[in-house]
């Protein structure tokens, strides 16, 4: 559970905006973060900011610059990286340093991919996209050749590293305080909550998606990594807490 949250337009945090009818005006407290999915996403972004503001300088010697954060409902949306729809799902655009979170993806992840309907499973998705922002800040994204595919491609390596960064957030979130309240944003996850997050990582593995959609697996076309790889690297970050 999220214990506290900052306002959606807090000046010291990531600026959250919406590109649809999603209402963030109700996001005023920890209670609303635990009640409304959109508020939990805002609070998760604030927690990610707090964790990376501490950890990126401490571990990599780099200053953390906060991304923009846009909530949308799967309808058409424009970014510096082009137009997107629900077929794309959540994504990070380095061109405008923005995390675009398609809120409709969560029901798709649960209904079509078999992921658990748990808060930490959804928060993992946000943390993964913020992981791509970390890659942009460190220069790792610019160095990678994202044109290829396959289990050992740079595209897959970037995705697995973003999973690891998501795990690093889980490791530190329950001990990183909200600068306004002094209390951590996130209570220490239970074993069941962690199981749900691991299930989400497994559900978005390329092999799992291909098996459900086509009945067979083609590793040469992978762009995100297998279920086993994604779970392993998320777990690595969660256990180590180290970049």
Region annotations inferred by a language model:
Residues 1-20:
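Long amphipathic alpha-helical segments used for membrane anchoring, targeting, substrate engagement
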Residues 28-37, 41-47, 57-80, 183-190:
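Acidic helix-start/capping segments at beta-turn-to-alpha-helix junctions
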Residues 39-45, 49-51, 55-58, 161-207:
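Short helix/loop segments within enzyme catalytic domains
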Residues 52, 101, 124-137, 159, ...:
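Active-site recognition of the HExxH zinc-binding catalytic motif
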Residues 75-102:
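Catalytic zinc-binding patch centered on the HExxH motif and its immediate surroundings
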Residues 107-124, 150-156:
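Short pre-active-site segment immediately N-terminal to the catalytic Zn-binding motif
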Residues 130-146, 168-169, 173-175:
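Catalytic Zn2+-binding segment of zinc metalloproteases
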